[in-house]
Design a protein with these regions (language model features):
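A short, surface-exposed helix-loop junction/capping segment
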Residues: 1-5, 45-48, 75-79
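A short, contiguous, amphipathic alpha-helix enriched in charged residues
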Residues: 13-25, 134
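Conserved polymerase palm-domain catalytic core
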Residues: 26-30, 34-40, 45, 77-81, ...
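Conserved pre-motif C helix in the palm subdomain of viral-like polymerases
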Residues: 49-78
Length: 150
């Protein structure tokens, strides 16, 4: 590909300035493929490990660009009661929602953690749903490539 993917973050401005034309061309042609993710395992409170795939800097920038485009497309369809990883939503908002719900008469709450949720997402179903709203095959191929490396 000719585009270096691993470099110190401090070199980002210099590297992206020289390499962006090649990255842009690959994105436009639909030939860009994300680089391999760096693997890292971090301990969970119960002692088990959570395995992470950390993308390189260029791939992170591209993922952020995709997020900025997809968020306004999909955000209106998400539950008002969902607060995780959503714009303008956080733990404080979730607590306020819980307090409002309690004040309205509810007395029970379910707390759950979907074990290994992202490991169990059906890739074909996810991509089918995304493709209903995203028609550009280059974007779909890019999302699929990112998903496969995660």
């Amino acid at each position: 590909m000719g585009v270096p993917r691993c470099f110190p973050l401090e070199q980002f401005a210099e590297t992206i300035a020289t390499d962006w034309p090649a990255v842009k061309q690959q994105l436009l042609e639909g030939t860009y493929r994300p680089g391999p993710a760096r693997r890292k395992s971090i301990p969970k409170p119960d002692g088990s490990l959570r395995h992470l795939g950390i993308p390189n800097v260029v791939d992170r920038v591209i993922q952020q660009a995709i997020l900025q485009i997809l968020t306004p497309i999909f955000e209106p369809h998400f539950s008002e009661s969902s607060f995780g990883f959503r714009p303008k939503r956080n733990a404080h908002g979730a607590i306020k929602q819980i307090q409002t719900t309690i004040r309205s008469g509810y007395r029970y709450c379910v707390d759950m953690d979907l074990s290994k949720f992202f490991d169990r997402v059906q890739h074909d179903v996810l991509m089918m749903r995304v493709s209903r709203k995203v028609r550009d095959r280059r974007v779909l191929r890019l999302i699929g490539g990112i998903y496969e490396l995660a």
